[in-house]
């Protein structure tokens, strides 16, 4: 793991200057952890190490606007694949072998996320960019959705900014955005329901905070800082609290997972702080690799910032920043097997969609495997649930097709044993308990 630990204190100065410029997953003592479907929340590793399997199929196609894939898995194992730009969803009830008809849904369009509440079985999407904060909820594994009001509480730094006169931006169409800020969930990975530790049952999802202190800056003037953060709910989605900001600015489109000891691992895209992209690369030579941090308090604060040189931040076509990547933890008892996805072309074209595996909770990433060599951009990952048709498989939903990165979305299904036949990265070793 590469990087330097950084203090979060400069964030206060940067943001203020810019503008002054418990529910729980069902479990009783001694009993197995179960979801609302009565299925185990976690199981053995062996099911992911069966005979290597790989297949792939197109789920959405169209012109040049097949953008922003979101993937979630309901407690019964139903897969939900969302095409964000078109507010469309397709479901698979047989582990990704076949996909149902396209459903028009209200949960997408440039501000989307999905969170599966394993205790209640509901699937939720929090929308906070356009007008009043809203929550969309499905009680039938994504077939239908209802709209609810929800409350999103600001964190302490946001309150400080509001005291200086900053106001929440309420419509995306505002031309004069100076002196405003907004939260959004654009291009973040699916949220999680915490299973372990003091905050078990908490719903947690990544988000982004964007301030607008001034009009569009000049090419060599810093843009307004963008900060990854998270939203968490301890009441099933009725109210949400904004976490502290990620310990580095110019970050967004992030992903998070819970580790087996209850810690939260946060992995974020890096976003350019300058409109002059050559200037951005000169000042931030590590622009095209991922950032990571951890939380020991259920996602409220973040610490131990690191720059992850082994994980590319995808292709930016020379623009000095990365793109949305996928992240999931396999539901394995007592182990932290993580899978990450992105284009293996840091800073170059958006091609070579690849997956990486970690067996020690993101300390090392010793193996990777190419999934799709042609065009490939944003991606999303989930792992199959024990006791369902999805069990033992990993699912990658990504932008990409033979005619371009944004002309199709495909779902690849594969086993961990398939990844293990890939390329060693030199960043740590695959442990014996995996290879046995």
Predicted regions and their residues:
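Asp-box/BNR beta-propeller blade signature and adjacent active/binding-site loops
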Residues: 25-436
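Serine residues within intrinsically disordered or low-complexity segments
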Residues: 7, 22-24
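Intrinsically disordered low-complexity regions specifically enriched for long asparagine
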Residues: 10-11, 32
